[in-house]
């Protein structure tokens, strides 16, 4: 058990035993740190944990107080997308959300989106209100504004958070949204390939036409990015698949790879729309007799947890689903800092990171 956990449990014991009374003002953070013999940073983290769990209230300019006994019990509803598609990010961030809720003493229920969409609005609103939820995690994204569940959630008048959203989600829904800086993340992945010495990079993107923005860029902008990084910039280096059409996706990705490798100047690396596309590139490369990374480097995007178990482990731009899940739980526990905030900010960025793994060869010293 680490020092922060020790402090949290000891202060919680003092509160539950009544030694620290509801409404009682505690010493400041520095004094508490000295009393417990821990660093000030450790105490700050412990106090934040207690605030998130509702044990204490921190009022800036006034101090730290033991929460009143009538403090609202936190209870969240997870609304799942209702599909078994392994590419849905919610599947990978929800375990971290649930773990954090458990640590913070939050009760969690789950509902399937299909159920909500086929239930009468008035009755569903009444039922959800009767359950006294204090927050909703809407584990779906890409709203067009016509979804029947939206008026249900709005009538509840409680915080709704999308833990992995599209750029337009907050504007369309009015809900809080966690997301990556997708444009910067995509650029950073390409920059990493350049740093590894790659001058010819093929892109396998998901899209149905050349006008759609993919990872924040049009096709022409993707070509400009290749040129900006000193890479071969030609439309022959870009292939499109539609990952939403799962039927035959494996064969379509293989055809994309064959098209790229048939070029007069075939790519040294493939930068994939997602880690799931990268998985199919692995399979196609194996059937084509290409070794990764000796013959072809492969880079993914998203941070699918299973990528590290591929052979070789998949290099990727990790959108950090773990951080998204934990942050979502903490934000729903502390809505005062965003839901009730008058500045109107609804979009919150989860930092990405480059996972440097063996699927990308390093052709020069970095």
Report each predicted region and the residues it spans.
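Flexible loop/turn connectors
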Residues: 10, 14, 175, 250, ...
């Amino acid at each position: 058990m680490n020092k922060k956990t020790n402090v949290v449990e000891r202060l919680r014991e003092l509160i539950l035993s009544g030694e620290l009374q509801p409404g009682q003002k505690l010493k400041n953070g520095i004094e508490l740190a000295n009393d417990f013999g821990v660093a000030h940073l450790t105490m700050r983290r412990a106090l934040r944990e207690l605030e998130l769990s509702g044990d204490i209230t921190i009022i800036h300019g006034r101090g730290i107080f033991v929460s009143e006994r009538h403090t609202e019990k936190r209870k969240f509803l997870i609304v799942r997308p209702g599909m078994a598609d392994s590419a849905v990010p919610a599947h990978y961030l929800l375990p971290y959300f649930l773990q954090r809720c458990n640590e913070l003493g939050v009760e969690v229920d789950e509902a399937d989106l299909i159920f909500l969409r086929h239930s009468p609005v008035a009755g569903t609103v009444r039922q959800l209100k009767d359950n006294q939820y204090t927050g909703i995690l809407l584990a779906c994204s890409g709203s067009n504004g016509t979804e029947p569940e939206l008026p249900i959630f709005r009538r509840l008048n409680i915080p709704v958070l999308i833990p992995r959203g599209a750029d337009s989600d907050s504007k369309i829904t009015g809900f809080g949204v966690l997301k990556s800086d997708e444009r910067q993340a995509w650029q950073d992945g390409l920059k990493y390939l350049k740093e590894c010495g790659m001058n010819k990079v093929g892109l396998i993107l998901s899209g149905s036409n050349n006008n759609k923005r993919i990872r924040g860029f049009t096709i022409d902008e993707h070509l400009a990015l290749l040129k900006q990084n000193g890479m071969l910039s030609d439309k022959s280096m870009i292939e499109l698949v539609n990952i939403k059409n799962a039927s035959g996706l494996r064969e379509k990705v293989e055809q994309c790879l064959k098209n790229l490798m048939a070029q007069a100047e075939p790519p040294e690396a493939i930068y994939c729309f997602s880690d799931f596309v990268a998985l199919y590139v692995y399979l196609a490369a194996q059937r084509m007799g290409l070794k990764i990374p000796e013959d072809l480097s492969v880079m993914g995007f998203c941070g699918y947890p299973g990528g590290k178990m591929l052979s070789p482990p998949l290099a990727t731009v990790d959108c950090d689903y773990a951080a998204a899940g934990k942050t979502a739980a903490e934000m729903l526990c502390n809505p005062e800092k965003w839901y009730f905030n008058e500045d109107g900010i609804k979009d919150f960025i989860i930092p990405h990171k480059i996972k440097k793994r063996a699927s990308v060869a390093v052709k020069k010293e970095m």
